[in-house]
Amino acid sequence: MTSVYIETTIPSYYHETRRSPMVTAWRAATRRWWDVCRHGYQLFTSAYALAELDLAPRGKGSRAIALLKDVPLLDEMPGFEEVTAYYIEHRLMPRDAQGDAAHLALASMHHMDFLLTWNCRHLANANKVQHLSVLNARLGLPVPVITTPLMLIPENYA
């Protein structure tokens, strides 16, 4: 079964309450994918995602964490900290995006097919794909497809 690493923004947007048009659209796509499409995938997340969600405003974080209660956690493999540091050292991720580097390292090291996120600045960013491919090739790691829920909704979904 195809594997998907669930990054922090997915459960966060599922419970998002802001009403801007973009946020409303992302929330709807997240809920549609989670409620209908996720069953076709093997889902994983991490302690990093749970820790980030735990920092969310009261109520939202606990609801987002509850959404992940049955999702297995990926553990840190040997070399995890080195891979995370390598991404930052080689400017794939800025120094203040250590959590994003951790999500990417976990998804890569565990050979995830997809990394699902709404973080289009640091993760689902087409401008970073080639750079990530080069770095992961040097490390002997596969490159997960980094995408948003919109891209994993089947074309025949009504």
Region roles according to the model:
Residues 1-45, 54-63, 89-95, 129-132, ...:
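Short, well-structured N-terminal submotif of metal-dependent ribonuclease cores
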Residues 3, 17-21, 26-27, 110-158:
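Acidic, PIN/NYN-like endoribonuclease modules and their adjacent C-terminal/linker elements
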Residues 8, 47, 118-120:
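Short secondary-structure boundary segments
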Residues 39-43, 69-72, 113:
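Short active-site oxyanion
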Residues 47, 77-78, 149-150:
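Residues at the C-termini of beta-strands that transition into short coil/loop
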Residues 51-78:
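A short, hydrophobic/aromatic-rich structural module that often spans a beta strand
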Residues 72-130, 153, 158:
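Active-site neighborhoods of divalent-metal-dependent phosphate/nucleic-acid chemistry enzymes
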